Structures are given as structure tokens and as C-alpha cells.
A protein has these predicted regions:
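C-terminal motif of bacterial Sec signal peptides marking the signal peptidase cleavage site
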Residues: 16-18
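Short coil/turn segments at secondary-structure boundaries
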Residues: 69-70, 121
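Short acidic/proline- and small/hydrophobic-mixed sequence motifs that coincide with surface turns
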Residues: 50-52, 62-67
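Sec-dependent N-terminal signal peptides
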Residues: 4-14
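Short, solvent-exposed loop/linker segments at beta-strand-coil boundaries, enriched for Pro/Gly
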Residues: 72-90
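Asparagine-centered strand-capping/turn motif at beta-strand->loop junctions
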Residues: 57-61
Length: 397
């Protein structure tokens, strides 16, 4: 009898264990929940320091979940993880019980006095669950600066409003500005940028002057305003497409950029009417736009005056004036010796239309292109294309 009871107990234990193992949620729709989608270490360090933050990972389902967790960065990452008590950069088959959670502790070590430390330190914790991938972003401030970190989103665009409606804001040169995501000047807002100010933009980020907003960049010959990527190592100084663009919509006043250096973007400046023309223009003077992976200057049905600028070494066009508009370009140098790939496009391109998703947008085009230098490594560096349904006038001399 005792032996029978022992066997019965053993069978019950095995059955209970087996039932538990079957209580696994393995459907393809599995999505974990997180206490935060981005962990920000927002302390500006003045000495070598470390700080730890906590991420809670929730299993919202009635069954247990197994997930793989790993840090995407290489072994030189500034971040380290402790996953539910285990120090590891990668851990597979981490079990999260039903309706329960685990803790991940994230640590960052920063030396802000090291000049080569990036302005922004970033990495990603990736979760792979039942074939689904989810990310939690890590962000730390590497050097002393003014950091602009998004607090809202529009579709896939994360942004922070730096000048709200009716607000005028001035950026000064005392400390650099670091943009993560997009910095937005809202409608009827105005951003002034003083001479000598440095703006570092993280990958895929940019500056957006929304319709009705206004940008005044007030650089000087001795102290230009610099826009560039946030990687400061020597290796990245000649790298293309480190950030996205300066995007300027129709302004409540003239947008003015004087003595600026805009480098290493995908598109240096994109000026376009988003809704309806307000009768104001973009004035670009004494500035340098260089090393854009796409276009240096792209305009769509805009009014632009450009004097004494250098636009150089772009992967597509240095200047593309499209979808109509009114343009004056005088005493500019366009130089294109882009060498990172094959460039099939001319350095300068004019058109009175623009096609998006097989839809043609067409407007009258007028351009005075006077006393400019155009040079490049392609046989043909200047091209025009137009539709006869709208006016096309190009005065080139």
C-alpha cells in the first residue's frame, strides 16, 4: 500500500509538472509590455560616473512566455544589463510567468571629460518572443550639452517642440545642442540661433520648421552656426547621412540662414510648401552645405534667394529645384566630387513638377541662376525637365 501511495504521488508530481510545462503562451501575436519604451539617463555628468535604471517587463497573458533578450550594441557599448539577477549581454529562453514580470537593470558608465565620447550614447535592448521583435531604446548623455529628447510622436516621427505657438526662443553658443529625434518649431513660433552655436543631430533626427514657423540662423564669418551629426570621432567626420535634414515649410516671416555649415545629413535643407504659400521666402547666404548622402538643397514650389553659398559633394543633386517655385541663385559654387558610390544624377536639376506615388504635382517655375560655378565629375552636371502644362522659365547666365 505504501509503495502504491509513493507511485501515485510520483505520478501526480510528474503530471503536475507536465501540465505546468504545457501552460506556455506560444501564439504569434505575443507582445510583452514594458514600463518604458525608452530609458533615458538624463543626468549631465561632470566626472566619471555610473548609474543604474530599472526596466520592468510584463507578461500580460494567462500562460508563461519565453523570450530571448539581448543588447544590440557591440562589446564596446557603454551599457550593460542584469536580466532577472543574471549579468549578461544576451540571455535566451527567459521565462516570464503568466500575469507576472521580470526586472532588467541597465547600467551606463560615462566619462564626460573624454573628448571623443559621443554627445549621445545609444543602444537597444531587443526582445524576441514567439517570432516577434520588440525594442526598448537606451539613451544617455555623453557630454555637457543642451539635450533635446522627444516627448511626443506623429506616426513614426518622434519630436520635441522647441518653440511653441507664439513663442520666440534663442539658442546661444555657450553649450552645444544635441537633437535626438526631431526638434520642431511650431506654427507662429520662432527659433533664433546665435553665431557660434553648434547643433549635433542624432541619426534620423533633424530640425523641422513647421508651417507658419520661422527660423533665423545668425552666424558670422568667424563664428558660423554648425549643424552636423553627433558622432565626434575622426572616423565619422567624412561620413554621409549621419542625420536626416533641416525641413522648412511655408513661413509666417522670411526664414533666414546666414553663415551656416550644414554637413553629413541625408538632405541638407528641404524647403517646401506644406499647405498654402504665405508669401514669404527662404534667404540662404554665405553658407556651406556638404556631404549630403541625398541632396544638398531640395526645394518644392518655394521662394528662395541664395547668395554666395557653397554646396558640395552630394550623393544625388547638390541643388534640386522642383515642382515649380521662384528662385534667385547668384554667386554660388556647386562642386560635386562624390566618391562613395556611382552618382547618376546631375549636380543641378530644375523642374516644374514633382511626382509622388505616380501623382504629378505641377506649378509655374521661374529661376534666375546668375554667375554661379557648377563643376562635377559627371559629363553632364546640369539638367532641366518640365511639363508644358505649367510655365517654365530659367534665366541662366
Amino acid at each position: 500500500m505504501k509503495r502504491f501511495v509513493s507511485y501515485l504521488f510520483l505520478f501526480s508530481a510528474i503530471a503536475f509538472t507536465s501540465c505546468n510545462k504545457l501552460n506556455i503562451y506560444d501564439k504569434k501575436d505575443a507582445k510583452l509590455k514594458f514600463s518604458s519604451s525608452i530609458i533615458t539617463f538624463d543626468t549631465i555628468f561632470t566626472s566619471v560616473s555610473s548609474i543604474t535604471k530599472r526596466l520592468v517587463v510584463y507578461n500580460p497573458y494567462s500562460g508563461d512566455i519565453n523570450t530571448d533578450i539581448y543588447l544590440l550594441g557591440d562589446n564596446n557599448s557603454y551599457f550593460s544589463l542584469n536580466i532577472n539577477g543574471v549579468a549578461a549581454r544576451k540571455l535566451t529562453d527567459v521565462e516570464i510567468p503568466a500575469k507576472d514580470s521580470i526586472f532588467i537593470f541597465v547600467k551606463v558608465i560615462i566619462n564626460p571629460n573624454q573628448q571623443n565620447t559621443p554627445m549621445l550614447l545609444t543602444d537597444t535592448i531587443r526582445f524576441f518572443t514567439n517570432g516577434n521583435t520588440q525594442n526598448v531604446e537606451l539613451l544617455a548623455y555623453g557630454q555637457d550639452a543642451n539635450f533635446i529628447v522627444p516627448n511626443r510622436s506623429l506616426g513614426n516621427l518622434s519630436y520635441f517642440i522647441v518653440a511653441g505657438e507664439g513663442e520666440e526662443v534663442t539658442w546661444t553658443k555657450e553649450k552645444p545642442y544635441v537633437i535626438y529625434g526631431y526638434a520642431v518649431v511650431d506654427s507662429v513660433g520662432k527659433l533664433n540661433i546665435e553665431a557660434g552655436t553648434k547643433i549635433y543631430v542624432h541619426k534620423k533626427g533633424g530640425l523641422w520648421i513647421y508651417k507658419g514657423g520661422c527660423l533665423h540662423v545668425n552666424g558670422t564669418q568667424d563664428e558660423p552656426v554648425v549643424f552636423q551629426g553627433d558622432r565626434l570621432e575622426d572616423f565619422f567626420q567624412d561620413d554621409y547621412e549621419q542625420w536626416d535634414r533641416i525641413w522648412i515649410n511655408e513661413g509666417s516671416q522670411d526664414n533666414i540662414i546666414n553663415y551656416a555649415v550644414i554637413k553629413n545629413a541625408f538632405i541638407g535643407i528641404q524647403a517646401e510648401i506644406l499647405d498654402k504659400d504665405m508669401g514669404n521666402k527662404l534667404i540662404l547666404t554665405n553658407s556651406i552645405i556638404k556631404k549630403s548622402a541625398g541632396m544638398g538643397f531640395l526645394a518644392k514650389n518655394y521662394t528662395v534667394e541664395a547668395y554666395n553659398n557653397i554646396i558640395a559633394n552630394c550623393g544625388q543633386h547638390c541643388i534640386a529645384l522642383t515642382q515649380g517655385g521662384t528662385y534667385t541663385f547668384i554667386h554660388n559654387t556647386i562642386y560635386n566630387a562624390y566618391s562613395l558610390g556611382t552618382r547618376a544624377t546631375p549636380s543641378v536639376f530644375f523642374s516644374n513638377y514633382y511626382i509622388v506615388n505616380n501623382v504629378m504635382y505641377l506649378s509655374d517655375f521661374h529661376c534666375d541662376f546668375i554667375n554661379n560655378i557648377v563643376w562635377g565629375t559627371n559629363k553632364r552636371e546640369f539638367n532641366c525637365d518640365y511639363d508644358k502644362s505649367a510655365l517654365f522659365q530659367a534665366n541662366i547666365s
